[in-house]
């Protein structure tokens, strides 16, 4: 069972690792603070969850920031997760009360969009990686971002 406001890790007997993030209270707070309509709140909540999962791969008080530059009315979506406990996020502009559908989500977040992921560390210079997005949902767009991808700049001496 998933606990509210937690990040949980599971490891199968065959070595498959699964990370589950529940950021429902944080997403609800973002919606309340920024007066977001439902579709925008869903989008920001999903990106908050993805950001928190990506941040759990790090140690030593590292953090991660996502800048999701859309080509839509939303403008840019900003999310941060750090130290494994703290998340925050906001969007430049909310949608015009569009119905919550996967099609509308894809229209707002991924048509000619750009995803910038920045990893912050206390001991290293921040590292940013940029991905051009095509047409997909949030999980499909965050799929290319992985532990290996975010650590690609490190050399063997760093590890």
Describe each PLM feature range:
Residues 51, 115, 131-133, 149:
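Hydrophobic transmembrane signal anchors and adjacent membrane-proximal interface regions, especially
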Residues 2-113, 117-120:
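N-terminal functional module of multi-domain proteins
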């Amino acid at each position: 069972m998933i606990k509210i406001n937690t990040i949980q890790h599971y490891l199968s007997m065959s070595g498959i690792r699964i990370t589950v993030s529940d950021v429902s209270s944080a997403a609800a707070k973002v919606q309340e603070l920024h007066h977001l309509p439902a579709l925008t709140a869903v989008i920001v909540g999903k990106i908050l969850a993805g950001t928190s999962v990506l941040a759990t791969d790090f140690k030593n008080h590292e953090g991660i920031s996502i800048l999701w530059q859309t080509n839509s009315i939303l403008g840019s979506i900003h999310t941060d997760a750090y130290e494994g406990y703290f998340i925050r996020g906001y969007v430049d502009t909310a949608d015009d009360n569009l119905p919550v559908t996967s099609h509308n989500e894809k229209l707002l977040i991924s048509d000619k969009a750009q995803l910038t992921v920045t990893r912050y560390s206390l001991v290293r210079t921040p590292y940013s990686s940029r991905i051009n997005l095509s047409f997909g949902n949030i999980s499909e767009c965050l799929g290319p971002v992985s532990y290996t991808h975010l650590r690609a700049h490190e050399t063997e001496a760093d590890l």
